[in-house]
Design a protein with these regions (language model features):
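Domain-level signature for soluble enzymes in the chorismate/prephenate branch of the shikimate pathway
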Residues: 1-295
């Protein structure tokens, strides 16, 4: 079977070989896999991909997966703008979301003590998230492509003087000890992940109370303000508004919006109201609000 994207693990698991796994970015043990388990359950098979583009390609291919999991924003770093573009160009719909607390731990092989550590390996973002702790030591900091990859290499090479920074799942999968837990500086750090499924396979979700849309306003003065007023007038909470430049235009933007509602009739009414003020509306998904959002 020819792959449509770059898959890190070239050998499929039995489940994902039947197109039943979900594509994720990063290696096994990554935060993407933790998000997949939180949504689907611990038995879900994952298809690790090198890039977000590959996540979308694999998720869009019925022969290779049943969908995908893709990070879209972080409570500290903000939105991952290129992923909005990937979503817009795909045949995928949002069918769910996960808000995952990002907890970084210092991992070592069994028997390694804190005084044995000379180097710490991890993704550059994870290292930056933990600098307040790392500054206490004179360790060499080495950047890798993925938090879980650093854990995997430490286990494979049986390193006695190298520690890694990664999540709890990476420690479990690679049989590493969490020598110091929760070394991240900002204790309230969440990443929001979208659960993606092919449009042809997606079905109406019972109890849905959130929608993600993209719209382009017409060029009338105050059009965006009027759109937002109409949305609020239908009792809908606008939980996110993200502008995106439209390729090939000079400072013309589309807007990604997350809308929270109590019943779908509110959404239907709002979409009908704003239609006359917009040049285009695209519904990316109607789904259930994540149950574990940060307060």
């Amino acid at each position: 079977m020819k792959s449509t994207g770059t898959i890190i693990n070239k050998i499929y698991s039995p489940l994902s070989a039947q197109g039943q796994g979900v594509s994720i970015q990063g290696y096994e043990g990554s935060f993407h896999q933790m998000a997949a388990r939180q949504f689907f359950g611990s038995d879900i098979e994952v298809i690790p991909c090198a890039t977000f583009r590959d996540v979308v390609k694999i998720a869009a291919n019925k022969k290779e997966s049943k969908g995908g999991v893709m990070a879209i924003e972080n409570s500290i770093a903000g939105s991952i703008l290129p992923n909005y573009t990937l979503l817009q160009k795909s045949n995928l719909k949002i069918v769910g979301e996960v808000y995952l607390p990002i907890k970084q731990h210092l991992l070592v092989n069994p028997g390694v003590k804190l005084e044995d550590i000379k180097e710490v390996h991890s993704h550059h973002m994870a290292i930056q998230q933990c600098m307040e702790y790392l500054d206490k030591y004179n360790w060499k900091l080495v950047e890798t492509d993925d938090t879980a990859l650093s854990a995997k290499h430490i286990q494979q090479h049986k390193s006695k003087h190298i520690a890694g920074i990664a999540g709890k799942l990476a420690a479990e999968l690679y049989n590493l000890n969490i020598i110091v837990p929760n070394i991240h500086t900002q204790k309230s750090n969440y990443t929001r992940f979208l659960i993606l499924q092919r449009s042809a396979d997606s079905k109406p979700i019972e109890g849905a109370n959130k929608a993600t849309i993209n719209f382009i306003t017409n060029h009338a003065k105050g059009a965006l303000a009027k759109v937002l007023t109409l949305i609020a007038g239908n009792g809908i909470n606008l939980s996110k508004l993200q502008s995106m430049p439209i390729a090939g235009t000079n400072f013309t933007y589309s807007f990604h919006a997350d809308l929270e509602f109590e019943n779908k009739s509110q959404l239907d009414s709002a979409l009908s109201d704003i239609e006359k003020l917009t040049e285009a509306i695209n519904i990316f998904g109607i789904y259930k609000n994540g149950n574990n959002q940060p307060s």
